[in-house]
Amino acid sequence: MEIALDDHDDEDLQSGLTALVVTVVELLVEALEGEAVRRMESGSLSDAEIERLGSQLQALEAELDRLQADQDIEAAVDEFKDDLDHVLRDAITQMSEADSTPGFEPQHSADGDSGGGSA
């Protein structure tokens, strides 16, 4: 999915940005769900917390679905997710190939950082 800023079509720009924001929020919800499952399995959540968390995540997903339908951006959100999936798969493949390359050693800075920087 591309957002063409030089297109001067405000509706397309708004739709594209909305799809991007919804995609990011959906990915965050997926991460939250994974963390919730991890905490449930570890026993660190009470039954009431599990119920409340499940209800909140369900409500958030329903609102995201409604927003996608109202804005007619389902296909754009799916396209963003597919594009991100391809980027991640390519990055993982490249990292795996680099790790299996004989003589390859990641460069480290003087402070022990691998050069990735900090955010």
From Swiss-Prot:
GO CC annotation, single: gas vesicle
Record has Ubl conjugation as a keyword: no
Pfam families in alphabetical order: GvpK
Disulfide bonds: none
Subcellular location(s) of the protein: Gas vesicle
Residue ranges crossing the lipid bilayer per the database entry: none
Induction trigger: In PHH4 (a deletion of the p-vac locus) transcribed in all growth phases, maximal expression in mid-stationary phase. An unstable 6kb transcript able to cover gvpD-gvpE-gvpF-gvpG-gvpH-gvpI-gvpJ-gvpK-gvpL-gvpM is detected, as well as smaller transcripts. Gas vesicles appear earlier when grown in static culture, possibly due to O(2)-limitation.
Subcellular location, principal: other
Region span, Disordered: 92-119
GO biological process: one example: gas vesicle organization
Keyword list, A-Z: Gas vesicle, Plasmid
Chain's role: Proteins GvpF to GvpM might be involved in nucleating gas vesicle formation. Gas vesicles are hollow, gas filled proteinaceous nanostructures found in several microbial planktonic microorganisms. They allow positioning of halobacteria at the optimal depth for growth in the poorly aerated, shallow brine pools of their habitat. Expression of 2 c-vac DNA fragments containing 2 divergently transcribed regions (gvpE-gvpF-gvpG-gvpH-gvpI-gvpJ-gvpK-gvpL-gvpM and gvpA-gvpC-gvpN-gvpO) allows H.volcanii to produce gas vesicles.
Assembly with partners or alone: GvpF to GvpM interact with each other in vitro, and may form multi-subunit complex(es).
Something else known: Encoded in a 14-gene locus called c-vac which produces cylindrical gas vesicles only in the stationary growth phase.
Family statement drawn from the similarity comment of this UniProt entry: Belongs to the gas vesicle GvpK family.
Name of this chain's protein: Gas vesicle protein K2
Organism, scientific name: Halobacterium salinarum (strain ATCC 700922 / JCM 11081 / NRC-1)
